[in-house]
Amino acid sequence: MSHRRDVETDDGTRIAIHARRPDRPAEDAVVFVHGATFGARPAFDTPGYSWLADTASRGRAAYAVDAVGYGDSDRPAAMDDPAGDPPSRADRVADDLRRVLDSLARDHDRLHLVGYSWGTMVAGLACTRGTELSSLVQFAPVYDPDPARVSAFDPGPDPAPKRETTRANTRDRWDAHLPTPSDYRDPDAFDRFWTTLFDGQGVRDDPPTVEAPNGTLLDLTAAATEGPIYDAGGITVPTLVVRGSLDRTATRADGLRLYDDLAADDAEYAEIANGSHFLAIERRREALFDRVAAFHDRQ
């Protein structure tokens, strides 16, 4: 069963943490950070596809953090101010994550951090901000993408504070990664994922629509036009870079650039065959879960 706990930041913002724990006290905890569009529960705790539940079943506590503006965390006032700056930039979220990690460190001896997509930027920044970590996993990282891909991220010269994504848009995006979606994704996977997402971020039923803050897109655009927003050369903890072989968002070339820039003596790069950017909710998810758990077992 999942549980929720909250952490308050210095400015009073409430950050939600979704937790699954093993039956016995756990010395190790794994902390997950979601990507730019979908919050913690759809990314890591979709019923029947839960990476949190898998982690807890292996004896580690599992926590997934909702960044500000996502899921059950506080909604920034800037999201509803057309003249406001797009909220939820990685730099701010990394500071919030540090507060979360410091809180969890009181309950566990070892913390393992897992970033996903845009969440790898947050995780990369957090690694250099003082909290002691036992390892880092950068899953489906967007690190130093080809500048030719900037149109996939750029919210424009006068970006709105938030964006909307419909159910149809979300399914089309996922389908675009897969040669034949039914060969790679269970029949009920999308519906379960969308229901979990809409429960946390839904704003309209006709058509079914969710919202996300646009600060994340500014981070991705900056990485594509200016280079990485965090210093991989400052990351010294054991690190695994892992992606699905079909991922069109987190490319092989970009993942290898991150791997090559890491300062960690213990660094690995891995690919999971026949998985997309949504690998954690696809049929090959167990291969991902096993690979990450094996990496954690060594630390």
Residue ranges: model-predicted function:
Residues 37-51, 253:
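The serine-hydrolase catalytic nucleophile loop
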Residues 84-105:
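Alpha/beta-hydrolase active-site loop
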Residues 47-76:
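Conserved alpha/beta-hydrolase
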Residues 275-286:
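Catalytic histidine-centered segment of alpha/beta-hydrolase-like enzymes
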